[in-house]
Amino acid sequence: MSQGGGLNILSIQSSVAYGHVGNSAAVFPLQRLGIEVWAVNTVHFSNHTGYGEWRGPVLAAGDVSEVLRGIGERGVLGSCGAVLSGYMGDVSLGEVILGAVGRVRGANPQALFCCDPVMGDEGRGFFVRPGIPRFMRERAVPAADVVTPNQFELEYLAGVEVRTLGGALAAAEKVLGLGPGTVLVTSLRRRDAGEEGRIEMLAATREGAWLVGTPLLPLEVNGAGDATAALFLGHLLLGRGLEEALSLTASSVYAVLEKTLRRGAREIQLVAAQESLVAPPVRFPVRRVA
């Protein structure tokens, strides 16, 4: 995976003052990896919406566009190695993000676009506005180099149910057929895993697929997927191979979640577990599955 023109990532996501989701979950892990982050916030909430109550503004697509325009006017887009996107409030914001990706690629053709296609999850279904799922499948994912769906999002993008490893591989192949070069399934639970109490990540390219599993912790938190996408992209930008990036990402995220569980915290403990972002204490092995 090419490093592009520099260790700088343009991250266009939501932001919260309290807790860790969106940019508030992505920026710090990337910085701990030694990567500069140009964070452009799409909302600025008091806390994430999982609490049921929150305050703060949603930025209009035009305001986000102005911030991105200002960054471009600094003449630095040629040193941007990647663009990272997450939750998109509406289709107009999605168009702004794709416009920014186009300008970055115009300045640095080797820049990566990592799209975390946030749409929903198992049990909750879709939680985004109408039009976003279709925009993700027809516009954002085809434009991306890397996509990081959870299992629910993988099923939607591929148009198939995923219950086995073979099903997951077939679904990942369908998503690769939409355009991206790498698919990271951030949370895979399958009937044929052979062991209860585990959760897996699956990384697939046109050359093969790799799987890593970790213990499934009794924990319900927000932001782990945002941190996962950021770490995986960061390791790729640093020039690490897919297998190493997968192992490091899964191992770091597990360490963060384990720390969160031990502390009985509602928010992922990125700061308390920050050494694990760089050097996870336990490295989970990766095996090739295709």
Curated annotation (Swiss-Prot):
Keyword check for Ion transport: no
Known pathway: Cofactor metabolism; pyridoxal 5'-phosphate salvage; pyridoxal 5'-phosphate from pyridoxal: step 1/1
SUPFAM superfamilies assigned to the protein according to its UniProt record, in alphabetical order: Ribokinase-like
UniProt family annotation: Belongs to the pyridoxine kinase family. PdxY subfamily.
Binding-site residues for ATP, renumbered to this chain: D116, E153
Protein name: Pyridoxal kinase PdxY
Name of the top EC class for this enzyme: transferase
Sequence positions that bind substrate: S14, D226
Chemical reaction(s) catalysed: pyridoxal + ATP = pyridoxal 5'-phosphate + ADP + H(+)
Record Gene3D superfamilies: 3.40.1190.20
Keywords recorded for this protein, A-Z: ATP-binding, Kinase, Magnesium, Nucleotide-binding, Transferase
GO cellular component terms, semicolon-separated: cytosol
Cofactor(s) needed: Mg(2+)
Subunit structure: Homodimer.
GO molecular function, one term: ATP binding
InterPro entries noted in UniProt: PM/HMP-P_kinase-1, PyrdxlKinase, Pyridoxal_kinase_PdxY, Ribokinase-like
Biological process according to GO: pyridoxal 5'-phosphate salvage
Top-rank taxon, per record: Bacteria
Record carries keyword Transit peptide: no
Pfam families to which the protein is assigned, alphabetical: Phos_pyr_kin (PF08543)
